[in-house]
UniProtKB/Swiss-Prot annotation:
NCBIfam families for the chain: PRK00819.1-2 (NF002013)
Record's protein name: Probable RNA 2'-phosphotransferase
Family (UniProt): Belongs to the KptA/TPT1 family.
Origin species: Pyrococcus horikoshii (strain ATCC 700860 / DSM 12428 / JCM 9974 / NBRC 100139 / OT-3)
PANTHER family: PUTATIVE PHOSPHOTRANSFERASE, TRNA 2'-PHOSPHOTRANSFERASE 1
Gene that this polypeptide is encoded by: kptA
Coiled-coil boundaries: none
Disulfide bonds: none
A Pfam family assignment: PTS_2-RNA
GO process terms (BP): tRNA splicing, via endonucleolytic cleavage and ligation
Amino acid sequence: MRFKVSKLMAYILRHSPWEFGLEPDEEGFVSIEELVNAVRKVYPWVTEEYIREIVERDEKGRYEIRGNKIRARYGHSYPVILRHEEDKESKVLYHGTVRRNLKGIMREGIKPMKRQYVHLSINYEDAYNTGRRHGEDVVVLIIDAECLRNKGYKILKAGKKVRIVKHVPVDCISGIL
């Protein structure tokens, strides 16, 4: 059940807080109490402790609690100001997608589409699993992080295993697995 509640939290915090009567601040934070009340519209038994446990156990670090407020750390489809630490260490990152997207990617690079940032993974497995959400015929792109930095792109640490960047130019894609 934790998975379903976490998915609802991600939907609310990343895409549709207003649908649930929430007003995020410029960084995407909302009151934990208000989020609990919003989630209770679907899962009436949810408590603040349960929400905090989801945040604590989340392997990807999707959520952030600051004081009595909570937000999604990445994946927003509405404008938010993210002040994440820059990743200056990674040499290689990965992006999972489905084969049908390759032609466009190899022409225009990886674009954020309906989100603010392109999501990259620090390992192959997570990138592959991300790609699987979009179909069976998954390919994993190898991203040269140094190339991104040399072109002036900032790679941000959005979660424990997730990095975000505004765009990945074609020439920073160093391979396809």
